[in-house]
Amino acid sequence: MAHYSYPSPDQHSILIVEMDRVGTFQRCRVVPMDGKSAGTQVGPEGACIGGAWSPDNRWMYFNVEVDGSTHLWRQRAPNGIPEQITFGPTEQQGLAMGPDGKYLITSLGVRQSSLFIHDPSGDHPVPLEGSVSTARLSSDGKRLYYLVEKGNSTDAIELWSRDLASGKSDALVTGQRIIDYDISPDQASVAFTVKNGDSSQIFFAPLDRSLPPRLIAKDARFVSFGGNGTLIFMQLGEKTNYLARIQADGSGLERIMDAPILTKNAVSPDAEWVVVGGVGTGGAIRGTTAVSTRDRSRRGICNGPCLVRWSSDGKYLYVTPGTSIDRLTSSGRTLVIALPRGMAGAQFPPAGLDNASDEELAGVQVIRHGLISPGPNPQNYVFETAAFQGNLFRIPLH
C-alpha cells in the first residue's frame, strides 16, 4: 500500500513510499505517471520512509532505515546504484530538497528510549543493557519480559526476563531475530515470531530451555496463546491475511473467520475474544474490532487503528487510540476501560473510542503513555518512552 508520493519534476514518474501486507515499510518504488506498470523498487534494501527528486530529474533521494539506523541515500534515476550520503551515530528523519538542488534539509539527531515501572508510589526506571523493546509484565507483576537487540537489527533480537525483586536478568531465547512474542499464562512456555528476510515463522518453546524451539507455522505473525493448548495468529497470504488458530504441537490449523484482516492485536485472558484491525468493506473487518472466537460475533472498539490489551484477569481493557501494532508512539494516551460484565457486555461509543467525546469518556482512567503493558491492576504497569531529539540541518550536495 502506498503512503507518500513524490512526483518527478518532469511529471513522468512518481516516487512512492509503501508498506507490505503487514504494515511494514519497504523499499521505495518508482511508478510511471500513466499507471501502465507497477514500476520497480529503488534505493537500498531497507525501510524507506521518505523521498525526494533533484530539480533536474537526475537523482532520487531516500530516507531509509538499514540495519537499525536511519540515514539518507541517493540513486541516479532511473536504475543507478544506491549510495549512502550520511553516516555516523546520529540519524536523519525526513528530507526536503532545496529549490536549486544544491542541498537537502533534514532533521538530524539521536533516538532515545527508556523503560519504567509504574506503581502507586510513582514511576521507577528499569536499568537494562542494550536496545530494549516490547516489554511486558507477568500476570502477577513480579517479572518483566522484553526483547533485546544484539548488534544491529539484522542480528539477533533475543527474549529476556527480569525478576523485579532481585533485579536478576535471564536470557530465555537467544540466537533468533524475534519480532513479537507471547508468554503462556503459567509462564512455562513462549510462542514467538522470527523474521528471516521477507518471511516470518512462529516457534514454540519451554521457558526453562529444556527443549529447543519448535517450528509451528510458516508465513505467520502476531502470535498469542489461545487457551486449551492452542495458538492464535495472523496467517499471511499472497494478497490478504487471515485470523488463524493452531495447536501448540503444529497440528489442527484452521481459520477462525473467512474475512481478511490487516493486523492482529491481543487475545483476551479467557481466549473468548481476539482483537483485529482492517480496512475492508462490506463484510470485511474495518477499524479495530474484537471478534468472538466462539461465534464470530464482533464488537467495534475503534473506527481507526488502536492498540488494545487486556489486564491479566480480564477486568480491564487498555486502548491506545491512533496507533498500530507496528507504528507505536510514546506520546498520546491509553484509556483504561472497566469490564464489569465482560467483553460481551461492554458499551463502546458508536464512533469508536478513538473519536469519543469527553462526555462519553467520563469516569474512564487515562494513562498519559502509549507504549504500556498492563500489570495486575490499573495502578501497576510498565511503559516505554521513545523520542527522537534533533534539529534541522542543511546537507550540501556535491
Predicted regions and their residues:
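Sequence signature of WD/YWTD-type beta-propeller architectures
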Residues: M1-H398
